[in-house]
């Protein structure tokens, strides 16, 4: 990467981090003043109302980060993504404030995706060698892109159930995709990864460690970050991009993206499939996600987030091992599919059996979960005071 490009990435990261660190408290005051809060109910895991405009603070960081990078490099390829993020942020905030029909949200997501396809040429038009397939015809590419982008947006939204999970996942995914984009010198995509990490880190600290400064990212933030995650996926596998050269290196781009997206995608598919089997709407909320399972087994929010993210990292490591061992792109895909199912649906089913039978394994897991409650530890208190500015 050229020096000016690298400088632009660093400036964008610092600017996005600093802006969110500054505006977080102000956005929180707005949320409290206008009663934009998430109230406890039978399905929620918090015990008191929590401000829910964290996505707005993150959006400020993303916008300022892009502006800060503009003197150093061309950010025009990211403007369609920014527009899509803005629309989904507005829709999500409206949902947080007054509640929207899931079908209306679904329709908006489809429209936004189609605009990205036709106006910004963002489509899944290449399998990058999976099963020997490269270019995908438009009649297949368009519906495939709609399903993938809308699915990813909703998957990120659905994992937003415990402190730090959706933001922590997006930070992890941004690092993973950022490494890929750095390898192929895709500068605009690297900037998007950098400002995503920079904007999410301050929010993550407040969301996880804060007490008086705790704020949820909300539907606005999770839908917005779903657009970012889907743009990573499209940039990784679409034709004509910098990542095309990865196929020559033996890197399975479809397996890689699926590995990074493992927990949101596989867990969402499992949950929706089970809802359909129970003859309920796939969009009907319940408490059957992986993070609900860890909470039920006695883990803290922080412990739950770390465990769920660890499961995702394990799948990425399985993919990396298969690549390093020289596996073909097809074999890499099968490794990701098998490990993804095992570490999500398989793990969920295994622990459900342990809970039903009250086994020794369950008692050990519960004992481990109890150790994740560290709110009384000095280091936790120090972090809490630091983020609350006490």
Feature-to-residue mapping (PLM):
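A generic, lipid-embedded transmembrane alpha helix
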Residues: 51-67, 114-119
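Alpha-helical transmembrane segments
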Residues: 2-30, 35, 59-87, 166-297, ...
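Juxtamembrane helix-capping/reentrant segments at transmembrane boundaries
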Residues: 39-53, 214
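Short aromatic-rich membrane-water interface segments that cap or initiate transmembrane helices
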Residues: 45-51, 131-142, 250-257
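Membrane-interfacial loop-to-helix junctions in multi-pass inner-membrane proteins
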Residues: 98-108, 140
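Membrane-embedded alpha-helical core segments of multi-pass
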Residues: 86-91, 108-123, 144-154, 170-176, ...
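Transmembrane alpha-helix boundary signature
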Residues: 64-76, 94-100, 117-131, 237-243
């Amino acid at each position: 990467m050229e020096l000016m490009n690298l400088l632009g990435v660093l400036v964008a990261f610092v600017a996005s981090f600093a802006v969110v660190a500054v505006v977080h408290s102000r956005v929180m005051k707005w949320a409290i003043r206008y009663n934009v809060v998430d109230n406890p109910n039978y399905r929620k895991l918090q015990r008191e109302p929590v401000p829910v405009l964290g996505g707005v603070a993150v959006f400020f960081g993303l916008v300022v980060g892009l502006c800060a990078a503009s003197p150093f490099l061309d950010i025009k390829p990211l403007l369609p993504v920014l527009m899509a993020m803005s629309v989904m942020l507005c829709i999500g905030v409206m949902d947080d404030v007054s509640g929207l029909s899931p079908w209306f949200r679904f329709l908006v997501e489809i429209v936004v995706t189609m605009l990205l396809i036709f106006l910004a040429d963002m489509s899944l038009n290449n399998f990058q060698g999976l099963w020997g397939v490269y270019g995908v015809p438009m009649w297949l590419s368009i519906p495939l892109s709609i399903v993938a982008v809308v699915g990813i947006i909703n998957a990120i939204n659905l994992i937003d159930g415990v402190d730090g999970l959706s933001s922590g996942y997006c930070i992890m995914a941004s690092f993973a995709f950022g490494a890929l984009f750095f390898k192929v010198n895709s500068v605009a995509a690297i900037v998007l990864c950098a400002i995503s990490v920079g904007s999410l880190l301050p929010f993550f600290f407040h969301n996880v460690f804060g007490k008086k400064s705790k704020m949820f990212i909300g539907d606005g933030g999770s839908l917005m970050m779903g657009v970012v995650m889907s743009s990573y996926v499209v940039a990784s596998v679409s034709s004509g991009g910098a990542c095309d050269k990865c196929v020559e290196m033996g890197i399975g781009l479809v397996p890689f993206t699926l590995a990074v997206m493992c927990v949101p995608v596989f867990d969402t598919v499992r949950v929706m499939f089970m809802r359909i089997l129970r003859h309920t709407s796939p969009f009907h909320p319940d408490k059957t996600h992986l993070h609900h399972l860890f909470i039920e087994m006695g883990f803290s929010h922080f412990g739950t987030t770390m465990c769920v993210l660890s499961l995702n990292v394990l799948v990425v490591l399985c993919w990396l091992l298969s690549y390093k061992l020289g596996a073909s792109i097809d074999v890499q895909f099968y490794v990701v599919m098998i490990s993804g199912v095992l570490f999500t649906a398989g793990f969920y089913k295994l622990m459900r059996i342990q809970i039903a039978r009250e086994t020794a394994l369950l008692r050990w897991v519960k004992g481990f979960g109890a150790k994740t409650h560290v709110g009384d530890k000095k280091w936790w208190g120090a972090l809490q005071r630091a983020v609350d500015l006490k």
